[in-house]
A protein has these predicted regions:
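Short, surface-exposed coil-to-beta transition loops
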Residues: 43-48, 93, 120-124
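Short, solvent-exposed loop/hinge segments that bridge or flank secondary-structure elements
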Residues: 36-54
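Short, low-complexity, Pro/Ser/Thr/Gly-rich segments in the mature regions of secreted, periplasmic
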Residues: 123-134
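Helix-rich interaction surfaces within compact, conserved domain-sized segments
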Residues: 92-113
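A short, Trp-centered hydrophobic/proline-enriched beta-strand micro-motif
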Residues: 25-37
Length: 134
């Protein structure tokens, strides 16, 4: 795994290196478990969610239609996570951490603290139990 901790905007391109591997593998259908780390309510929102992706779209979260899941719009496909990373890096966070999967290139762990002077605006995602389904 690649661990990257940085606060420099010039490192943004390096932080998306996992994307090159991910994109080259052309993975469109997969399952994963995703957690969101934030100061969010209700508590259920931050619990691990089993996500099924087909054609790069979330088709189920914990076996249900995504729209039946609390905060469903905050759960992301791998491609959406890469877009999220790029957006957050462009906003120049004070601290961030990203770990990429060596085999597939997707982000396994990402965490952003945009301002150390503001409480409760940090956000993180963890991806595990990744499995290609097609």
């Amino acid at each position: 795994m690649l661990l990257s901790i940085s606060c420099s905007k010039s490192d943004n391109i390096d932080q998306l290196k996992g994307f090159e591997l991910w994109e080259s593998l052309n993975i469109n259908d997969y399952n994963m478990t995703q957690t969101i780390s934030c100061f969010c309510f209700p508590y259920e929102f931050t619990q691990p969610k089993d996500i099924e992706v087909e054609n790069n779209l979330i088709i189920s979260i914990d076996g249900k239609n995504p729209t039946e899941t609390i905060g469903y719009s905050s759960f992301m496909t791998i491609n959406e996570l890469f877009d999220f990373i790029e957006s957050k890096l462009n906003d120049q966070p004070e601290f961030y951490e990203i770990e990429y999967n060596e085999e597939y290139g997707y982000p396994e762990i990402l965490y952003f603290d945009m301002s150390k002077m503001i409480a409760d605006e940090e956000i993180g995602y963890n991806i595990f139990n990744f499995k290609i389904t097609n």
